[in-house]
Curated annotation (Swiss-Prot):
Region entry Basic, spans: 52-55
This protein's UniProt keywords: DNA-binding, Host-virus interaction, Inhibition of host innate immune response by virus, Metal-binding, Suppressor of RNA silencing, Viral immunoevasion, Zinc, Zinc-finger
Task performed by this protein: Suppressor of viral-induced RNA silencing. The potential mechanism of action is based on sequestering siRNAs.
The keyword Zinc is assigned to this record: yes
Protein name: RNA silencing suppressor
Protein family per UniProt: Belongs to the carlaviruses nucleic acid-binding protein family.
BP GO terms, sorted: regulation of DNA-templated transcription; symbiont-mediated suppression of host innate immune response
Organism of provenance: Poplar mosaic virus (isolate ATCC Pv275)
Keyword Protein biosynthesis: no
Spans through the membrane: none
Amino acid sequence: MVNMRKVLALMQVFRERYDHKCDFNFCDIAVSIVCRSELDFINEPGLSNYAKRRRARRLGRCVRCFRVNPGFYFTKRCDGITCVPGISWNYDVEDYIKRGRVTGDRETPSTFHGYGYPVGHKT
């Protein structure tokens, strides 16, 4: 779904800058640019530490080791300060927290219940 407000705003900028030089419709170019730019921000953008903490808090995970946070009464390995990931951890959760994107064919962070990468994923 294309955001028409963005398309119209982009068309207006094109008309203001290039209308006297060109005589074609800018609609196709604007739609193409908006579609390509929205692909990068389908999930949650941002690579800052604040963005990572925000995504981890949304999932209820630790930013450093990707374990469930707050932990259970028997949790001893995650203190949120000096913890590190274990031998194997959920790579989908790591990718979402660190980069803000969902790997594979999953679309929402609420579907992080599997283990590792989806079948057919090239690493």
